[in-house]
Design a protein with these regions (language model features):
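NTP/phosphate- and nucleic-acid-binding module
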Residues: 1-29, 34-577
């Protein structure tokens, strides 16, 4: 039986033939399998293809399906290949690349269709049920992903083992559309964008800012238990900083350049090089270590406009950032501390449940030690420590050799959201490179100079991306501590407003985010507004409440909670905070 990847790859061929049958002047480029189906990038020339054209192409695919059987490997010489694709410059470019690498040209034929292909197809096309796939959408895509090249049309298809699996996936997609953070962000008045400000530069409203502050405050509250020290750095720097750190060669095309009166500056794309300079500002002793610097600050990356996506991919990025400077012997304890912080934070979000997360340990490739910086024994000690810690902390981990950065191994926490999508969030990264590049030193117990280890960590990571995930995970129904408005205070009529105002003062004194909805509007409209805004609790005050010296409490998640005394309500909110 063929794999789902082989089925998806085979369907990409079928899609290509269907396109040529309807658009014979189209130029095919490449068509791989994807995690959910397949696609083919096509140059349609003067023809314009939109989603409205997909049913016609899909119908042609299903008409062709029973006429195809197996995939046959076809041999062609270089000259034969060039002749066959003489009218397709894209295929010719691929052919020349394959030849230049000294690799063999391979072609596969099914039905009347022949394509340049490495292989990996079904044994027989009858393994693919006609109702297990469908065309999904079209999008623009540059040839080879380079914006300097031609713009092509990417035709996406979905494909699963059966119609049932396809339907389950489509249902998840519908859920995802309803939860889309761009849609909910607008409905809940959390953030906006402006053409005058620029793409990828979100503007947070008071409610969106309240959520951001709640997240940052919670991270600081948790990490504050571990003697962290808050630092603050400027948003621009001389290029020399990144030339020393080694980031210049990698990031120089993604930097925003600022020309001053005398010097050139760049907007910082990360914070770690700045933090090294705080460490380097005076002589350090082993007695000071570990030093745990933390900061919530913005960084800037000049992302391509086509890659921007709501809050998920932006140009101004708020990082919940931290860098620990420690001795190699302290790696174990420091990583455990960071895991503890991550566990506490994601437990609050309800994500730290068995079966809902996994941990990826990215290690160096032992077969290619020359690709990595730092002493081999330090790497081995660090990787052994990470493995041992993962076991001691009962983390569901996997080791991925060859996935480490050149400067150190790392731990990534992968969580499933409410509809089963896996999201990479918390990260712990060991760095043996940057301290050396900057000549960082501390005086050890024996009086010798040693180089510290640097540990990068992100709890929430990019706050914008985290918020996009949180909005979609909770569908706007944020937990009490995160909600932009935690309580809606609703007096029924004007005569109930004084009691509501008195309670409003008490709630504000507790630090509760309250929306006082006075009686100027219809009572029913105010209730609807509070529910539409997904406010966790409503407090209603009417005649019976004032007579009993109580209030009526309603929960978004639990429904009616009945009459409560003022002290009972205040105590509930103290505990929820």
């Amino acid at each position: 039986m063929s794999t789902i990847e082989e089925k998806r790859h085979s369907l990409a061929h079928l899609l290509a033939q269907a396109i040529l049958n309807i658009y014979p002047e189209a130029k095919l480029t490449i068509g791989p399998a994807t995690e959910t189906g397949f696609y083919y990038d096509v140059d349609f020339g003067t023809s314009k293809l939109t989603d409205q054209n997909l049913p016609k192409i899909e119908k042609e695919m299903k008409k062709l399906l029973p006429t195809w059987d197996t995939f046959e490997s076809i041999s062609k010489t270089a000259d034969e290949a060039r002749e066959y694709f003489k009218d397709n410059t894209y295929k010719l470019e691929l052919i020349e690349e394959i030849i230049s690498r000294g690799e063999q040209l391979t072609f596969y034929k099914s039905g009347d269709f022949i394509d340049l292909c490495r292989g990996g197809h079904v044994a027989h096309m009858n393994e693919i049920p006609a109702d297990s796939f469908e065309l999904d959408k079209t999008a623009g895509a540059y040839w080879r992903g380079d914006e300097k090249n031609s713009m092509l049309t990417r035709v996406y298809g979905l494909a699963f083992e059966s119609k049932e699996e396809l339907d389950v996936y489509k249902h998840k997609i519908e859920q995802a559309k309803e939860r889309d953070h761009r849609k909910l962000g607008k409905e809940l008045d959390l953030f906006t964008f402006s053409d005058l400000v620029g793409g990828g530069l979100p503007l947070f409203t008071p409610k969106g800012t309240a959520i951001r502050n709640a997240i940052i405050d919670k991270v600081y509250e948790i990490q504050g238990e571990y003697d962290t020290q808050e630092v603050c750095i400027p948003h621009i720097t001389k290029p020399d900083l990144y030339k020393t750190s080694g980031h210049w060669d990698k990031f120089k095309d993604e930097l925003f350049h600022v020309h001053g009166r005398e010097n050139e500056f760049v907007m910082k794309p990360m914070n770690c090089p700045h933090h090294t300079q705080i460490f380097a500002s005076k002589p350090r002793s082993y007695k000071e270590l570990p030093l745990r610097y933390v900061e919530s600050t913005m960084v800037y990356r000049d992302e391509q406009s086509g890659e921007l996506l709501g809050l998920g991919r932006v140009r101004s990025i708020t990082q919940d950032d931290g860098h620990t400077f420690c001795t190699p012997e302290q790696i174990d304890q420091e990583v455990k501390i960071l895991i503890s912080i991550i566990k506490k934070f994601y437990t609050l979000l309800g994500l730290m449940k068995e079966g809902n997360y996994r941990v990826s340990l990215s290690f160096r490739d032992p077969k290619e030690p020359q690709k990595y910086l730092g002493d081999e024994s330090v790497w081995e000690t660090a990787q052994a420590a990470l493995t041992r810690i993962a076991q001691e902390e009962n983390l569901p981990y996997e080791i991925f050799e060859g996935e480490a950065a050149f400067y150190g191994p790392k731990i990534d926490f992968m969580f499933k959201d409410a509809i089963g999508r896996e999201r990479q969030l918390g990260t712990i990264q060991l760095d043996f490179n940057m301290p050396s590049r900057f000549g960082l030193e501390f005086t050890d117990k024996d009086g010798t100079k040693k180089t510290p280890v640097m540990i990068h960590r992100a709890i929430a990571g990019s706050l914008e991306r985290f918020l996009s995930i949180a909005i979609e995970h909770f569908a706007g129904n944020f937990p009490f501590w995160m909600a932009p408005v935690q309580v809606a205070l609703i007096p029924i009529k004007e005569q109930h407003e004084q009691a509501a105002k008195d309670l409003h003062k008490q709630l504000k004194a507790l630090g509760i985010r309250v929306d006082y909805m006075n009686s100027n509007d219809n009572f029913g409209k105010r209730i609807k507004k509070a529910k539409d805004e997904r406010v966790p609790y409503f407090i209603i005050i009417g005649d019976k409440d004032i007579e009993a010296n109580k209030v009526t409490l309603e929960s978004r998640d639990e429904g009616q909670l009945g009459q409560k005394s003022i002290e009972e309500v205040l105590q509930l909110f103290r505990e929820l905070k």
